[in-house]
């Protein structure tokens, strides 16, 4: 469709705004300044607010949040509480909250759900990591920023306001803050994002963009656009930029983090840098419109020329301060990430949090900050307490996770040096892909890789090329920022697409009913489709019900597009239009109800024991056992498991009612928060809420007991770490728990009988046996070492010269451990050892001066694998044949 948007609004006509075309960038804009020839934005105009605040008073960040919110509240907008910075709490297409409108996507913007208020105002903290490498360097970039926004959702039935009022509100806010109205320009522009589009204004003053006013009214379809039912006012005001412009500080960082910056400077012993230098750098950064760090070296050169200083001297002077700026920004970002419950891991939002944290720790090391990161974040929490008290409520978790992650970081760095050294043996260049692989798979920062490679190059034995891009962390973050739907590999046959009415689910209204009558709508393959059913279809982690239809077994129940498919053993017994009698296997259903209710109970108990940060990432409810996957930053201890189990059974014994109600989506979120989505994102404007009174509330479509007392005894059977940052708890209920305890008891009794001791003596006896075994093992290892030393002398004369190396290929009697001990004694310098025993075991080990990979060698002379310095496997050829192959390899 052809779009011709008229950017003229009522305010422009009333006040005499003129439409002009910028002489620098050719963009069209509106201004009250008749003499203006440029649009006002950088790089067409430089920052003119640095050292010269543009508002009638200086505002702190907290004051600006309040001023913005109060202004729009006075204009009839209802203030709405911020959402978490973890967008995954309510949507499954992005990980982090990147804009205020993301809070209302996809449910409100699609028209499926009404907005909680209309119009509304929100000050939403957002996180974008696509500029993380620019933070600290350009003077304006932030990873975490607050998007102030007023939104209006206009429909056919409810119209609020559109372009005229939006521009009027913006201009009035500028005047209220004391900004000279002649300096304000409205640039005509176009916005696209998330599949939507619309015209917009970029609102500029003194060289800086303070707001964007978007009028979302189209859907992008290929290369064309379609109108959408809602006309959405989507504005974004940069709260931090307003505060910066009101203070006129050299960079945005001083306006936000002055206390933190001063303490970090003092701690690191960084001398004061002339404010003019930082102001010049920020101003030139604006003029260059820096959006990638490839331009930063050019920026540094321009600043050096402008102030008459050598570029290397300038770099040495301001780099430490830029690191401090970045640390200040990153620690605020981490405060929101961890405060909103992100658990560091190697995937998804946990990966991004760990990336920011490790980058911060690396910068702290680089400039020698002795303060702990916990102390810095504690300062940030205190400074934000007035506006975000909920972050301070998570302080204990935040401090614990920082402790845990800092230890992991140190271990990673220590281990990483060896990994890089081994990689470097067979490399002439460490590429960007290598750097990303080392970071993603092993957590090794690129700076550590470069340090190790530089050390190798200094030794002069070989030269390895390496270049670490200035925007490395941006590249890595962008690969992980967008949520990609997990590929689910189904073992079930794909259900057909059918045009029949959705199945009425009777178990919502009649959870204890066992029998029902229904009409057959259709039969397809082995499936019967009914107009109504009591059978629960597999979903939400819960297994399907089983039972009978007219006495014919129902062995599987699935759902697609609201239609329930009942798999029967004899489809010929059913015809369209028949009335059938359905009967549930109640014993099977009861087990599922108990285990599903137990999932909610254990999740609540785990939250009390481990903290509010835990989040359900998955569950599986079967008849015999259930399992619950939750985020947590360390292994759950034995004591914690016992406490979770104790609290869970306390909830059971407390006979808490389990209530099921259907609620409006907005009402549910407002009343209970986003924790209702623990079981996953639920579509629709109406949610089924399961509430265990005073214990747990979730949006859930499964079957549950009506009272916790019906669950029976809950036994946590085991925990395991299924991935970094995710713990799995496996449990049973009722008679299932009794059976599991009986199995454990049998193991205990059988073990005691084997040892001929009473049950209560088992731990003590096993401990004694283990200590004795360790002593014997130590003795055996010492004997093996001595044997190895003796054999060393026997084999010393059997080395043969092949190229630059001395090679030993020998068949030796002994266990793999004994052969390893012999090889350890012989593999030094330029010696290459190949040992075989009578059981076809093959061992290859090299001295430190041998460059040939043992992993590659063993693949050529046998079968096996290992590392570059040591490989093990099997052989099938004779000693002579193996020797000949090695000779050919070494004498190429």
Curated annotation (Swiss-Prot):
Keyword Transcription regulation carried by entry: no
Localisation per UniProt entry: Cytoplasm
Cofactor, how bound (note): Binds 1 zinc ion per subunit.
Record's catalysed reaction(s): tRNA(Ala) + L-alanine + ATP = L-alanyl-tRNA(Ala) + AMP + diphosphate
GO cellular component, one term: cytoplasm
One record GO biological process: alanyl-tRNA aminoacylation
Pfam families: tRNA-synt_2c (PF01411), tRNA_SAD (PF07973)
UniProt keyword list: Aminoacyl-tRNA synthetase, ATP-binding, Cytoplasm, Ligase, Metal-binding, Nucleotide-binding, Protein biosynthesis, RNA-binding, tRNA-binding, Zinc
Gene Ontology MF terms: alanine-tRNA ligase activity; aminoacyl-tRNA deacylase activity; ATP binding; tRNA binding; zinc ion binding
Residues binding Zn(2+), per UniProt: 596, 600, 700, 704
Keyword Zinc among record annotations: yes
Cross-referenced SMART domains: tRNA_SAD
CDD domains: AlaRS_core (cd00673)
InterPro entries: aa-tRNA-synth_II/BPL/LPL (IPR045864), Ala-tRNA-lgiase_IIc (IPR002318), Ala-tRNA-ligase_IIc_anticod-bd (IPR018162), Ala-tRNA-synth_IIc_core (IPR018165), Ala-tRNA-synth_IIc_N (IPR018164), Ala-tRNA_lgiase_arc (IPR022429), Ala-tRNA_ligase (IPR050058), Thr/Ala-tRNA-synth_IIc_edit (IPR018163)
Family: Belongs to the class-II aminoacyl-tRNA synthetase family.
Record's function text: Catalyzes the attachment of alanine to tRNA(Ala) in a two-step reaction: alanine is first activated by ATP to form Ala-AMP and then transferred to the acceptor end of tRNA(Ala). Also edits incorrectly charged Ser-tRNA(Ala) and Gly-tRNA(Ala) via its editing domain.
Protein name: Alanine--tRNA ligase
